[in-house]
């Protein structure tokens, strides 16, 4: 039987001669290989009778006339969700092999856009703005490419559910990537602009209800991430599962004016009171600019209850300016919320970074600490710190190490940049 020829399905909100007046109707007719071409106009429940989520079938390309020209307006449709964060509570749901390009996607009550778990998708040249929860939810894709988009003011419902650990789990990222068990989890995020998120500009995590052994690789390249109410980038190899294997490359981004951290990476950060063990995070942070946050780049081996987790971090060639506390901060393990952190490790190379106006202490490396009186034992940082340009501080070191609580250690490889080893226990701060 001969293969079906691909079709072009045209949608217009204003041209009465167009075959379709709503995107919903055209997508119901589209099959793999088809392109749904959407003319200028506002497409919404009240204007064109849209039904959300708009499901883009496998292999279908949905193309608008450009940002600001073709607008998909949710008018507050869809709901926030947590544990799980639901892909179906999104204005647009992308099937495997589908593409979304050339739209302003606005005003969803839940998420703006999501992929079906495991789907390979391309999301490019869109504006994604003012959604109640996340701008874009990426769940376990075979491969997702997210390129040349503008994200603005996502997390409008200011949703901050309490996690089982009794801490606030802010929801409202521009892009929320969740690694899924048994899936490929390959994501490329490049050339995007992300401004004013309620939580983080970009969060990449293995969520706490996944099975053990999740593998994920994310590349974050040449993005602008700014003015997030919490962090620019959050990276967590595990919020609960053990044996995760996560690799994240962060290169040539500008990350500025975020409240807490520019980049915070954690091999294990339990959000429920269950032990995480042997999760590995490899994070490579090269040639970024980080400006004006609480801390610049922070690496954490494992929080309690965590044991035997490893973060392998490379921080090279970055410009870090205007931090209130530290430009680079590394801690092997942190006892947390009544639970111990034991035998977690960070291996770190910190080299050829330029630090300006760094606040309290430009580079600070600590073996083990605790939030209150929790145990932290056997945690270790093995670091090579060399050839960084650091400001001179009157009466204070520019680079210091502290073993922390008894039974933890920081080891520096030679050659090592001039530093001070601080005695006693330096208190942990979030």
Describe each region flagged by the PLM:
Residues 48-53, 75-92, 107-114, 130-138, ...:
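Extracellular beta-strand/beta-solenoid scaffold signature
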Residues 36, 54, 60, 70, ...:
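Solenoid scaffold repeats with emphasis on beta-solenoid/beta-helix
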Residues 27-34:
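Beta-strand repeat architectures
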Residues 2, 388-390, 403-430:
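Extracellular/surface-exposed low-complexity segments
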Residues 5, 13-17, 40, 44-47, ...:
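Right-handed parallel beta-helix/beta-spiral solenoid domain characteristic of secreted/periplasmic
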């Amino acid at each position: 039987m001969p293969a079906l020829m691909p079709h072009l399905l045209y949608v217009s909100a204003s041209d009465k001669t167009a075959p379709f007046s709503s995107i919903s109707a055209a997508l119901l007719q589209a099959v793999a290989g088809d392109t749904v071409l959407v003319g200028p106009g506002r497409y919404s429940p009240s204007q064109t009778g849209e039904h959300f989520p708009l499901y883009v079938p496998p292999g279908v390309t949905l193309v608008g006339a450009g940002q600001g020209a073709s607008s998909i307006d949710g008018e507050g449709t869809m709901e926030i969700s947590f544990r799980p964060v639901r892909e179906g509570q999104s204005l647009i749901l992308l099937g495997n092999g589908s593409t979304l390009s050339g739209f302003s996607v606005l005003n969803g009550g839940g998420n703006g856009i999501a992929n079906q778990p495991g789907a390979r998708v391309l999301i490019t040249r869109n504006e994604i703005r003012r959604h109640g929860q996340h701008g874009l939810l990426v769940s376990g894709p075979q491969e997702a490419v997210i390129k040349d988009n503008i994200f603005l003011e996502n997390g409008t419902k200011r949703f901050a559910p309490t996690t089982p650990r009794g801490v606030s789990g802010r929801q409202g990222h521009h892009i929320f990537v969740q690694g899924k068990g048994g899936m490929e989890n390959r994501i490329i995020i490049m050339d995007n602009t992300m401004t004013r998120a309620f939580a983080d500009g970009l969060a990449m995590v293995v969520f706490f209800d996944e099975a053990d052994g999740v593998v994920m690789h994310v590349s974050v390249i040449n993005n602008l991430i700014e003015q997030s109410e919490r962090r620019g980038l959050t990276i967590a190899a595990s919020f609960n599962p053990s044996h995760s294997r996560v690799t994240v490359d962060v290169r040539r981004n500008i990350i500025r004016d975020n409240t807490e951290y520019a980049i915070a990476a954690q091999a294990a950060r339990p959000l429920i009171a269950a032990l995480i063990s042997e999760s590995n995070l490899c994070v490579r942070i090269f040639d970024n600019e980080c400006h004006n946050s609480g801390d610049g780049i922070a690496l954490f081996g494992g929080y309690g209850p965590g044991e035997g987790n490893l973060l392998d971090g490379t921080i090279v060639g970055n410009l870090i300016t205007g931090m209130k506390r530290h430009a680079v901060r590394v801690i092997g393990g942190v006892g947390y919320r009544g639970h111990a952190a034991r035998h977690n490790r960070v291996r770190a190379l910190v080299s050829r970074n330029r630090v300006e106006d760094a606040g309290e202490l430009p580079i600070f490396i600590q073996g083990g600490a605790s939030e209150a009186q929790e145990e932290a034992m056997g945690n270790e940082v093995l670091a090579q710190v060399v050839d960084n340009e650091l400001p001179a501080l009157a009466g204070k070191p520019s680079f210091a190490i502290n073993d922390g609580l008894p039974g933890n250690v920081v080891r520096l490889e030679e050659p090592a940049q001039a530093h001070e080893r601080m005695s006693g226990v330096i208190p942990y701060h979030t």
